[in-house]
């Protein structure tokens, strides 16, 4: 199956045509959900249609006995390069980043995979001029009832962009979180940040985090919905 699409505004050329939007997504070819890889599709318009890149996967994974790479999101670094953040079960996992020169799909330059420590596998960034913000799906309480494959607390943290993301010191500062006490749901998962089309903050004053809550037990699937939590950043950056 394929899932977890992430769309960004980014101009690239492919087979003599110019495209304005890119989509990265997870693709898996096994019933046990191992061997996940990251694919690429492109479009001239945000609404599509999206054309699958014919040299996929963009980020490959060889081992069929492990989960692989996926659940990606992109920050547009400049007119030629993206920063691709994703979950990985390589030695650099569980959360990684690559810089990829992607403005010409006939000449892609895939940067080395960098480990980003101190964050959970399901983490998603947004940039401002001074800071990088990160929402992460975490497991705070024991997860015993189904759905056991998602977490219970979505955490929001930040660090200055001057700090090394791959550094060996945990510089992440928590702003807040959305957990069972805040939402009324035992599961809170798959968070993301409201950004512009290139992955940057819309305002320095507030941050909107989206996430999915769920009930536990047999009705978990029918309880999925989209919620949001708004954080006032003025109180954190006086």
Residue spans for each PLM region:
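Beta-rich carbohydrate-recognition and catalytic domains
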Residues: 1-3, 8-67, 75-121, 126-186, ...
